[in-house]
Amino acid sequence: MGEMEQLRQEAEQLKKQIADARKACADITLAELVSGLEVVGRVQMRTRRTLRGHLAKIYAMHWATDSKLLVSASQDGKLIVWDTYTTNKVHAIPLRSSWVMTCAYAPSGNFVACGGLDNMCSIYNLKSREGNVKVSRELSAHTGYLSCCRFLDDNNIVTSSGDTTCALWDIETGQQKTVFVGHTGDCMSLAVSPDYKLFISGACDASAKLWDVREGTCRQTFTGHESDINAICFFPNGEAICTGSDDASCRLFDLRADQELTAYSQESIICGITSVAFSLSGRLLFAGYDDFNCNVWDSLKCERVGILSGHDNRVSCLGVTADGMAVATGSWDSFLKIWN
């Protein structure tokens, strides 16, 4: 047996010891805890709005904090800001690169950002004096594609990249303040905690990591998926996270218990997950799939309680409004749908 093999076995044994130690700390399972709870009734949601205007696949969307406006990014090379009440386009921003993979709305509503295969994060000012939307910053230092970006405020944004790193940027100077290193595969997704002090990332190494924005350190690593993690989100209270993977499952991890609580999957679901988001209470989990559907899960009972079907192609992105009143899905069929 080679030295490499010996070390590999040793590492596996240590991993098992850690898993056993974590299990020993758990005083109760989620299933036991909610055994007396009724399952949420059938969740039937209707399409209230269809946003038409993109001419190609939609890759990303993000709600503004006002729960009215949203930004979407498409392969047609446009970033569109929509008024979801009227379905009007507030801004249609032509991009320098049409290979866009992510977009984000600043909490203030003043800026939007996007990026993709150009390896850059472009910041657009929606409130410029001239009234026209133009690039205010291009943040370039990543050596791989930009997979996700999220604002902390008007001067700070966090990005994840195919170069396996995440980064915190000072938008004013255009410089990286902190680089978050630790993943061993392409970083696919990130989400910021409700208090903006932490963020989580999911990667192609099948792990999720919790990072401290100020300290620049990795606090926790969560494993369990058998394939790439494509999507990640915080539970509304910030004390748990959910991941969506190509292994056809979503998983719920508790930050305080430092371990997986449950998985959301069914034998009939064999395709990957592209996007995840919780309802305002956290009781419902919305997950977008490659099979054109969005499944609604009871997050506590781990049962599927609804399906949002209305797209003719992969559901690539979704999001729940800050006020919890609506969920938006975006698809490769070039449409966005607003449900409630």
Swiss-Prot record:
<dbReference type="GO" id="GO:0051020">
    <property type="term" value="F:GTPase binding"/>
</dbReference>
<feature type="repeat" description="WD 1">
    <location>
        <begin position="53"/>
        <end position="83"/>
    </location>
</feature>
<dbReference type="GO" id="GO:0045598">
    <property type="term" value="P:regulation of fat cell differentiation"/>
</dbReference>
<dbReference type="GO" id="GO:0006884">
    <property type="term" value="P:cell volume homeostasis"/>
</dbReference>
<dbReference type="GO" id="GO:1903725">
    <property type="term" value="P:regulation of phospholipid metabolic process"/>
</dbReference>
<dbReference type="GO" id="GO:0003924">
    <property type="term" value="F:GTPase activity"/>
</dbReference>
<feature type="repeat" description="WD 5">
    <location>
        <begin position="224"/>
        <end position="254"/>
    </location>
</feature>
<dbReference type="InterPro" id="IPR015943">
    <property type="entry name" value="WD40/YVTN_repeat-like_dom_sf"/>
</dbReference>
<keyword id="KW-0853">WD repeat</keyword>
<dbReference type="GO" id="GO:0005834">
    <property type="term" value="C:heterotrimeric G-protein complex"/>
</dbReference>
<dbReference type="GO" id="GO:0030425">
    <property type="term" value="C:dendrite"/>
</dbReference>
<dbReference type="InterPro" id="IPR001680">
    <property type="entry name" value="WD40_rpt"/>
</dbReference>
<keyword id="KW-0677">Repeat</keyword>
<feature type="repeat" description="WD 3">
    <location>
        <begin position="141"/>
        <end position="170"/>
    </location>
</feature>
<dbReference type="InterPro" id="IPR016346">
    <property type="entry name" value="Guanine_nucleotide-bd_bsu"/>
</dbReference>
<feature type="repeat" description="WD 7">
    <location>
        <begin position="310"/>
        <end position="340"/>
    </location>
</feature>
<dbReference type="Pfam" id="PF25391">
    <property type="entry name" value="WD40_Gbeta"/>
</dbReference>
<comment type="subunit">
    <text>G proteins are composed of 3 units, alpha, beta and gamma. Interacts with RASD2.</text>
</comment>
<dbReference type="GO" id="GO:0032350">
    <property type="term" value="P:regulation of hormone metabolic process"/>
</dbReference>
<dbReference type="GO" id="GO:0044297">
    <property type="term" value="C:cell body"/>
</dbReference>
<feature type="repeat" description="WD 6">
    <location>
        <begin position="268"/>
        <end position="298"/>
    </location>
</feature>
<protein>
    <recommendedName>
        <fullName>Guanine nucleotide-binding protein G(I)/G(S)/G(T) subunit beta-3</fullName>
    </recommendedName>
</protein>
<feature type="repeat" description="WD 4">
    <location>
        <begin position="182"/>
        <end position="212"/>
    </location>
</feature>
<dbReference type="GO" id="GO:0010468">
    <property type="term" value="P:regulation of gene expression"/>
</dbReference>
<dbReference type="InterPro" id="IPR001632">
    <property type="entry name" value="Gprotein_B"/>
</dbReference>
<dbReference type="GO" id="GO:0090207">
    <property type="term" value="P:regulation of triglyceride metabolic process"/>
</dbReference>
<dbReference type="InterPro" id="IPR019775">
    <property type="entry name" value="WD40_repeat_CS"/>
</dbReference>
<comment type="function">
    <text>Guanine nucleotide-binding proteins (G proteins) are involved as a modulator or transducer in various transmembrane signaling systems. The beta and gamma chains are required for the GTPase activity, for replacement of GDP by GTP, and for G protein-effector interaction.</text>
</comment>
<keyword id="KW-0807">Transducer</keyword>
<feature type="repeat" description="WD 2">
    <location>
        <begin position="95"/>
        <end position="125"/>
    </location>
</feature>
<dbReference type="GO" id="GO:0007186">
    <property type="term" value="P:G protein-coupled receptor signaling pathway"/>
</dbReference>
<dbReference type="GO" id="GO:0090181">
    <property type="term" value="P:regulation of cholesterol metabolic process"/>
</dbReference>
<dbReference type="InterPro" id="IPR020472">
    <property type="entry name" value="G-protein_beta_WD-40_rep"/>
</dbReference>
<dbReference type="GO" id="GO:0010906">
    <property type="term" value="P:regulation of glucose metabolic process"/>
</dbReference>
<comment type="similarity">
    <text>Belongs to the WD repeat G protein beta family.</text>
</comment>
<dbReference type="GO" id="GO:0030507">
    <property type="term" value="F:spectrin binding"/>
</dbReference>
<dbReference type="InterPro" id="IPR036322">
    <property type="entry name" value="WD40_repeat_dom_sf"/>
</dbReference>
